[in-house]
């Protein structure tokens, strides 16, 4: 599935949990920018479905997705949420490892923090 990462990101942005579930492997591992880790379909789906609706003003803008062979992809994007009534934009890179069946087996999230 060449467009698996794009489908996954669109489903995250639109809170389409059925599509997210279709895109991920049973043994998915997600490692967040602060070392937080969720392993397995159940834990990951519970985390993401609980978190996303709580983010006020959430928006995702995908700049590009780059596939490296059949096993890895990189997504450059930004996520925006409202903080104290003002939009806060966070640039990110997500690194995806893809399983043999094309589903997402691992997601590593890296964020760009402001200097200071």
Task: For each feature predicted by the language model, list its residue ranges.
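Amphipathic alpha-helical repeat scaffolds
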Residues: 6-10
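A beta-strand edge to alpha-helix "cap/lid" segment located at domain peripheries
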Residues: 13, 31, 45-116
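Short, well-ordered alpha-helical segments enriched in acidic and aromatic residues
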Residues: 14-31
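Short beta-edge strand/loop motif at the mouth of beta-sheet-based domains
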Residues: 37-46
């Amino acid at each position: 599935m060449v467009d698996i990462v794009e489908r996954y990101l669109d489903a995250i942005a639109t809170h389409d949990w059925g599509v997210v579930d279709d895109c991920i492997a049973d043994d998915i591992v997600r490692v967040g920018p602060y070392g937080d880790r969720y392993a397995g379909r159940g834990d990951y789906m519970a985390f993401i479905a609980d978190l996303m609706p709580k983010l006020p003003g959430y928006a995702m803008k995908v700049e590009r997705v780059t596939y490296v062979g059949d096993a890895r992809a990189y997504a450059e994007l930004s996520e925006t949420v409202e903080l104290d009534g003002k939009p806060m934009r966070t640039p990110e890179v997500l690194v995806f490892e893809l399983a043999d069946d094309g589903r997402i087996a691992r997601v590593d999230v890296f964020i760009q923090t402001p200097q200071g």
